[in-house]
Amino acid sequence: DPADIGCTYEAIIRVNSQSGKAGSAWLLETEHSVRLPRGMEVEFSQIIQKKADQTGLEMTSDVIWDVYEEVYLNLNSPFELVSFDSQKAGADQETIHAVLLHKGKTVSISETGNGPISALVNAIRAHFDVQFKLADFGQNTRSSTSRAEAAAYVELTDGKTNQSVYGAGIDTSITLAPVRALISALNRLS
């Protein structure tokens, strides 16, 4: 136990090119309150290990967060979310209205589904030449303060290659976080 020698687990966790999959995911969860699903944990650890191989350095929590933001959160091409609204359209239906920038062009889309993610998936399939399957999505709360944020994760399967890609989104809205995650995954798919 690290406490036996006056340390904490955080002080002895090292992520480098020889690290296993859990190190970077553990640091994201403990330092940034982001819990990755298993498949995304594997994908992200490979990205971190490649970065560690390229630099020859240990990956600190801050570097791991910067890579996470770069790979999942700050993607704005070819899709960028401009606005999003969701309204009940019956007992089990919601209608979304979204404005996206797609390859520099503003596109307004509307569609109905059994929830906001389903409706947005339907709208994107109807308006863009993108073939994918929504394989999984989920979210967790990043803090319990009055400024709580949701961290969401989406897994898409490419309709052409059958490869999985993950996207992530963070927002104070529990509706917008998975919407942002879907856009992130679409941008990684493209």
Regions found by a protein language model. Name each.
Residues 1-110, 144-149:
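A mid-to-C-terminal "edge-of-domain" accessory segment
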Residues 16, 108-115, 166-177:
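Short alpha-helix boundary/capping segments
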Residues 31, 35, 39, 129-137, ...:
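Glycine-rich phosphate/pyrophosphate-binding loops
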Residues 89, 95, 103-128, 132-143:
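Small-residue-enriched alpha-helical segments and adjacent helix-cap loops
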Residues 112-116, 124, 154-164, 179-181:
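Terminal-proximal interaction/regulatory segments of ATP-powered molecular machines
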Residues 130-163, 168:
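Generic long, charged, amphipathic alpha-helical segments
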Residues 161-166, 170-190:
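Mixed-charge, glycine-accented linear interaction segment located at domain edges/termini
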